[in-house]
């Protein structure tokens, strides 16, 4: 019997399961209540389980004896535990979701009452009906499994065929997921807001969510990013540009970025761009990810209300879900009830974008929020999204990042070549290639690729809406960046007026866009159009825009009016400032919302500048002007309701004046607008704007000083208002900046012109309260400027006055004072020099002797002069030039001061004696010494008075002292009255600015008090004591006199500073002194009575202890029990201890601290002692300049004279107050010249500063760093290209070795074929045996045109023959012709047009260079040795490694001349050895192979042999996709082939490292030699090789990137050059999964899934476009079937490889339309690698069948049929060497053809070939090989793409006019012929050969590149069912017939079973057996081959005419332009 271990065992399982459940709860925020309920239910379940399996125990401690063995009991117990645990685990798994849902549903009801705004307005969606998915019955169409699907009572499950719709089968519920996501993984978590919402949420709710809940500002630009969902990598340079440009565009414009939100594809790239921004919260870019809720990984963790969810952004590649990108700030998780399905967010995102685009940027503007789409990479859904954007109303501009891949590259290319009209000639000519590219790029089928092609065309119909961004390195300057491209695209797409564009640019703050796109040449702006923009730029502090507007015609003088300036002061934009704080000081009771007036601003300026300054806004003149202007501008500039409230309060009092004052528009303007704007910028703390205004306008030096003073005063106010310390420091730094600029400007001006610089300092400033720069510098405490030599020269000049003495000046002045007659001996300045000195107005007028005329020039009333003089500043300077009391008009006397008059006076006019005395006594130095002498005499007299006994009546010494001090008091009163401010308090504050003045006043008042006591008998002694005390100050006042001295002045300043600092120290000392003094006094004298003497007793002894007096007896007085001694007080022993501590602290610590402070003060002042003294000197000069002439006490006479003068002026009605400040009065013209000099100095100063900045170390380091980064990038590119070049060379060498082995076997087969043909061909002596026909390895056609003189005439050409004038018959390899009489001529390659844009010729992508150098050849020599043959084949094989070769055969037109055009088929490869990576492989053609001959019967003239040229192989050879696809073919290859494939794979890994953009080059002609021809030889001989130097083609290194656009352009621009395949990861993706790494397999799995998601979005967008009119509908985009069948999708590649499958039988088929099957291979009509035949094709079907594999191993394809063993791999012709033709029309070629053709002409869209088609052609046929330009060398060994091989046909063409036959020789591309047509081809070829004797024969050999079926339809009439004989009968007979005997011999000697070997490749598995080939050729596998038919009547005419052009250009030794020579 088995018992449980414990009756509590079931609870163990409960605890264990509950622990697991707690883990789930931790991530799902499930409360403990749910856990408790779950534990309870689980406990009940366990109890039931336990009851079923276990017996009930009697007691907890009782155990039933065990009757079974111990081991059995243990096993049963474990089995029981396992059963219970598994059962409970199942319960947990099944019920945890229901518990979470129950909690989520009940939580809002319990804890969120009422619900939040988000829950009220946003909903989620849940599927309520189970509809089985067609692919999986256990899953619903919504994506949920059946076991977890919600079931609603009353709703039955649907059937598998039902259509699931989110609107019908889901129900909305309040959202249960919103809050904050904290992305973990970094140093600090990145937070993002999220919300789950329904797919049909209204966009206005979303905008409210952004603005109200998430506190976002509305965007000024919306950038919606579209791209691929699958992960992709951007090229490094492009990635850097995209990241930088996107971030800059978003941050500078305040844009929002919309993305997909998930961490895949393009959203991941955007997230990486946002990563550069950093973690800052403020100013973070608003990036909003809109993702489907159902695809979010672990979305159950997001459930909760306003939660903070920790999240790790780590995705699982095997999961179909995705994680959110951790760089986004906001997420909208769109829910439509589906799980793991994309597409839910598309409709919502588009509706939201459309809604935002309709929002206004500003409340009062008409411009809406611009939206732009940025396309990066992308899939099929991206193309459809772009289509939806550009066709929407209003359309959305699209910016495409070219080079990012896939959809973006295709859009960029199609956009580039799209035309505005309906016709798209270039794109239509490339239609098939584009469709193929789409198939490969998106891995879709043909139907869908054609649909995507049409959508691309529809996108480009709105070409102006699409802008392509591509990195371009322009030598002339910087390329346009992505942010500029985005903003420019908006201007291009939205047809906005220039003001609207300027407003947008201002909103974005992008002055570069405004400069490049708006202010362009030719843009005219009406008057005032830019004023609003200027106002907006000033308000928003847009410095660059203000500068730009000033540059483009905005006149600030006309712009700035009084209302606008007041509006600027009241703007809410811009930085925070302290203007409001200061304004509350001048206007204490300001209501809320008060609008500042200019009068208020004037009061603030006056407060900040000090009493010396009066703002123009506070002048009486300004008040009526302000009132009149504001009344006039009230309706225009202000709202009437607010304007009436904020009007200036004094305007009503001036209503009469305002009404009478005439209003003019000029009244509202300012004379110096930049000055007003400078003050506005300073007061509102806009430093950069202030600096801009400082650089503009006049009076720059004065503006810098005013700004410095304002900033310092504002800093002082900020410190007093206890504002942040940062504000104080910021304002101080701004003040220092202006202080420095002013000083440097003065220094620069002084170096330019010292005299004018001095004038700048002393001239009167009308705009700044009539002050001078010197007085402003003193007010700003600008010591450096006053210490400048320019200022010191002025001060020295002012100090000396009219004197001019150099030595012993003081002695001479004292001597002059003592002996007045000595004054005549002193030197004085001339009258001219005196007039140029600064002076007061009074002196100026007196010097002009104009006082007697003052009555005639009384000042008019203010009202009469308002309109003219309102801008004249009448304020006078204060103490440093301040004396005036009231306003005055300075214009009345300024007209009398004309410097030009004084220039006419003699330069050295001496002064009169009277003037000398006046100048001597009024000089400041004279006044100083007179005052000093008088003061010293006063001190002597006053000292005598206090030292001797004071009598009842004062002595004369005392009377003198009384008189001196009394008159000094009157002088101080005069100084107060003469100060500028009107208010007495302001006057006193100005006077008290100098600290000696208040001290003088206190001493005088004290003396007067003592004097009052002195004259009373009983208090005379008190008066005497006051005298004695007062004498202390009068002695100390000597320091003021000593301050003038250069050495003593700084020391006096130090003393003053030390006294200030000592006051703080005294406070500390008093604290320590009182603490110990009170303690000592209280202990020693406990019984003291309260008296005032206690204060003295407390402080007396401790204070004097500081100076060494210890008072030892008092510290510890003797005491004891001895009666002679006083008793000891309690605690008497404490006193010595405390006093010892006191002396330690006070005497040592505090005194030394004071010494250290004084030492610090000395060091500070001593370092600037020179500046301090110079600054003090200015104060002394100004003080003595304004003093009266006589010193006290004689100064009373001067006071009496001034009073009398004042009364006289007042009686006469004259203005008595004059400005006594020292200034220079200049005429207006002189002032303008001075301002011009100052402006020039400002410009020179900035230029000098710029030079200094560029030469500074920091700037040089910065420039060096940028250059090093650029060089590093280029070196990295060079290194990368060098590595790839090295890998390419190694790969080529490996392939060449393999080709050598293959060539040996090929040559052995050739020898067998040659012997066989020699045996079976009659007339061997007449026919020349040749190796020109290399069977099977050359995709060429050879036509033999035989004139009637050479052979007999015959009937018309067969149906296999070409055209109405001749027949084209296939010529067998063994056909016997009399070729000895044919001349072999070399072909000459002509140069391309200089205007042609094409890739680098001769250069592989990896950098390997090849060059084709033709050499003379001997065609009759025979290759006698195997080694020679091997060498030829090696050269021939190496030629195949080239990318392509353009071969052109210039032929002259001769009717009866035999010409043989021959090209050397073999080339030898010579690789230059050396260490350089730029070594090139030189390809030297090896002669003596009659391959690709064009034979024409005629005369054997040797002079008709032009040169032969080869176009060297060019273009990129081995791209990533090119080599990667080779892996698929390697499975069936032999060991040799596998080695080659391995080389490809190894190369792929290196080739994928670099991508390059094609450069623009042009080929150069070679100087080729004529090839001599030897006749009579039956076998070709061994050619002689002539080494020729290779051309030096420079390797151009590119730092650009490549894209699909490059590859498409290569097709569009190349001359039959191959198209490099698209780069892809096929090499890694097509490998078996066992060979992949784990990361590769995961990436493959993820990419596959994400591409399916792109297709799903593509289908949803289709519904969106169809329902364009109802975009606001709820879910039209979702009304799509759930299951989408992708079975029709084709793989990415177009597979046309050939697989040898002898076991598979082939099926015979009839000939179909040639246009349809010309390019068919293996039954696939889209196959572009198939080979066709020109003329009647002879198909061979040796049991081989086409397989849909892509051929890429063309270069080694000669091994395919050489080996008879089955192990020999099959090769297929590659698109690499035989690409489709380029789709580009050339206008010149078209015109040249039209000149020589009839009207019935139809030209093909082929870029270089225009075939004229006759209107009467009926039954002609021609194969698909019609292209003139061949992409590969004609004589290269290669196989077809099809089972049938390249045909060698004979085309018999008979001239239709005049009986002369004209022959054209050109390589012709052949269409692919399938093996299924073998039988039919043999019949056609035999019939063609039978009719060959009736006409001239033209032999052509051409390769077999792919052909476009669509173009064949357009160019040829296709004959599908008529027999070929009808075409031959329709050919008219010409009198000159060809040799019929030879032609019949060709047809009769050729046996029917052997026809396949004559027309096609005879390299079969056994070349000796003809019976095998007969059997195998009877098989066919292509049932749908059609041969197009064309008439050659007009074709030959046009070809003949064009060939004459070629001939003429060839004879003139000039290569003809390509565009004019294409046939």
Swiss-Prot record:
Topological region Extracellular: 675-927, 1014-1024, 1079-1136
Superkingdom classification of source: Eukaryota
Membrane topology label: Multi-pass membrane protein
Feature: compositional bias, Gly residues: 1351-1365, 1711-1724
Residues in compartment: Cytoplasmic: 1-653, 949-992, 1046-1057, 1158-2023
Record key words, sorted: Ion channel, Ion transport, Membrane, Phosphoprotein, Transmembrane, Transmembrane helix, Transport
Effect on the protein of changing residue 1915 to R: In RNA edited version
InterPro entries documented for this protein: Ion_trans_dom, TRPM, TRPM_SLOG, TRPM_tetra, TRPM_tetra_sf
Sample GO molecular function, one term: monoatomic cation channel activity
Localization in the cell: Membrane
GO cellular component: cation channel complex; plasma membrane
GO biological process, alphabetically ordered: intracellular zinc ion homeostasis; magnesium ion homeostasis; metal ion transport; monoatomic cation transmembrane transport; protein tetramerization
Family in the record: Belongs to the transient receptor (TC 1.A.4) family. LTrpC subfamily.
Function: Calcium channel mediating constitutive calcium ion entry.
Protein name: Transient receptor potential cation channel trpm
Organism (species): Drosophila melanogaster (Fruit fly)
